[in-house]
């Protein structure tokens, strides 16, 4: 990709490779775009920039902060104008688009230096293309089932292992303004309808994509999932959840208004902040499965949040050195402890390291965190089960699955007809996004 970006300046491709292998002191200004904008994470990143500068006096790391949505606009417009950073945080779906735009440099040497076998293979695969790695995941979180221990015990219910048991338990709890069995979030401005359907389809050993890259919404498992969530929406969910986005949904659990919910370890701090009286009443369990005898920890949804280095950078060697510096053991653990239980180590040895586990929150919720960590080892982003695909971004960014639910619930469209229509729309959107469909 390098030569194409340089046009007539053929010599610059030689400079790139020499720079990658370069020796001598690191020097220059490294601009980093970071979407770690909240308090402790943001403070940590600034501190790392200062510490790296102290170690490498000729290098200054400049941190610029952008929310994830601002970042998305900024890098896509920046690519045309040449206004891109040297290093940045990213999301797996961004990385797919960046690789396709030839905007990134391979980071295999950095990964090997940190220790390739320390990373889960699926996490690295999300940033791989033609055998090269273009992203380095820095933390992970995974979707699991959260529940209220106090509510289950007051109703004499055990923790559901299957989808059928979950539906029965949620219906036994019922719905009232103070407590809902669970909420089924279907807002068209978010991806939760796709997320919940994906759980169900993954538990049946399928994906939301067929092997040829087209959408899978009309298989028996997919139709079963659509009917399942439609039924639970009608029977136990707040009516308004038809328009819920991520925060609306999470807030209900934070406030103690849902008995079951699906989310990551970020739920721990959310409940602690909103309902400190409930901190001993929440726990996580593996996602429900089809049959109780099915494997407990099937691959479902994991978010691996990566860092990338940009092709247009003139300080690639310095940017890579800073990236690697962030994985220094004690510094990396400090980062994870800034949101304990929410940001999980992507390095499997750190997950077991006493200096990581010896944290009040991590000790208190160790059983729940183990459930999440187990899923981190096997799951992927929705639609990326076979590596980086453009389809993954379409599945989660265009609200098509959510609109299908609206059509079933509001317009009373037949489930099979709505699923077939949505499948067709998804396939058209995949092609429009440049997906190569076999």
Regions found by a protein language model. Give the residues of each.
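Short, solvent-exposed loop/beta-turn-alpha elements that line the ligand-binding surface or hinge
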Residues: 26, 105-121, 186-189, 204-224, ...
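A structural signal for short loop-to-beta-strand junctions that line the ligand-binding cleft
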Residues: 85-86, 115-152, 180-181, 294-299, ...
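Hinge/lid segment of periplasmic solute-binding proteins
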Residues: 92-143, 158, 192-196, 283-285, ...
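Glycine-centered hinge/linker elements that transmit conformational signals in sensory
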Residues: 170-172, 214-242, 287
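C-terminal lobe and pocket-closing loops
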Residues: 266-278, 291-399, 437
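Conserved N-terminal structural module of periplasmic/extracytoplasmic solute-binding proteins
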Residues: 1-97, 112-116, 159, 242, ...
């Amino acid at each position: 990709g390098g030569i194409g970006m340089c046009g007539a300046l053929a010599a610059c491709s030689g400079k790139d490779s020499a720079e990658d292998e370069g020796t001598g002191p690191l020097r220059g200004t490294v601009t980093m775009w970071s979407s770690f904008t909240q308090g402790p994470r943001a403070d940590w990143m600034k501190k790392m920039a200062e510490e790296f500068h102290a170690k490498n006096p000729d290098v200054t790391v400049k941190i610029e902060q952008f929310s994830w949505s601002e970042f998305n606009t900024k890098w896509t417009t920046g690519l045309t104008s040449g206004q891109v950073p040297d290093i940045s945080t990213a999301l797996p779906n961004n990385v797919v688009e960046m690789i396709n735009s030839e905007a990134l440099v391979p980071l295999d040497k950095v990964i090997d230096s940190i220790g390739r076998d320390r990373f889960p293979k699926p996490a690295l695969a999300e940033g791989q293309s033609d055998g090269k790695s273009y992203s380095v995941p820095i933390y992970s979180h995974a979707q699991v089932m959260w529940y209220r221990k106090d509510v289950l015990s007051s109703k004499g219910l055990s923790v559901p292992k299957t989808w059928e048991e979950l539906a029965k338990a949620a219906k036994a709890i019922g719905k009232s303004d103070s407590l809902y069995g669970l909420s089924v979030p279907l807002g068209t401005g978010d991806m939760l309808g796709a997320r919940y359907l994906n759980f169900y389809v993954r538990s049946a050993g399928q994906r939301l994509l067929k092997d040829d890259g087209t959408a899978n919404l009309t298989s028996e498992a997919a139709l079963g999932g659509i009917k399942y969530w439609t039924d639970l929406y009608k029977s136990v969910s707040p009516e308004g959840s038809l328009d819920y986005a991520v925060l609306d949904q999470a807030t209900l659990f934070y406030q103690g208004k849902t008995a079951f919910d699906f989310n990551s370890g970020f739920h721990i701090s959310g409940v602690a902040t909103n309902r400190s009286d409930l901190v001993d009443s929440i726990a996580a369990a593996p996602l429900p499965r089809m049959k109780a005898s099915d494997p407990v920890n099937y691959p479902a949804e994991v978010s691996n949040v990566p860092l990338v280095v940009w092709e247009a950078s003139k300080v690639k060697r310095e940017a890579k050195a800073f990236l690697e510096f962030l994985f220094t053991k004690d510094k990396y653990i400090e980062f994870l402890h800034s949101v304990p239980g929410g940001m999980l180590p992507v390095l499997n040895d750190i997950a077991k390291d006493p200096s990581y586990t010896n944290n009040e929150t991590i000790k208190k919720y160790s059983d729940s965190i183990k459930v999440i960590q187990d899923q981190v080892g096997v799951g992927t982003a929705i639609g990326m089960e076979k590596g980086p695909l453009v389809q993954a971004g379409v599945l989660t960014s265009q609200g098509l699955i959510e609109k299908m639910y609206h059509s079933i619930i509001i317009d009373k469209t037949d489930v099979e007809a709505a699923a077939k229509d949505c499948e067709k729309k998804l396939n058209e959107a995949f092609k429009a996004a440049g997906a190569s469909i076999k």
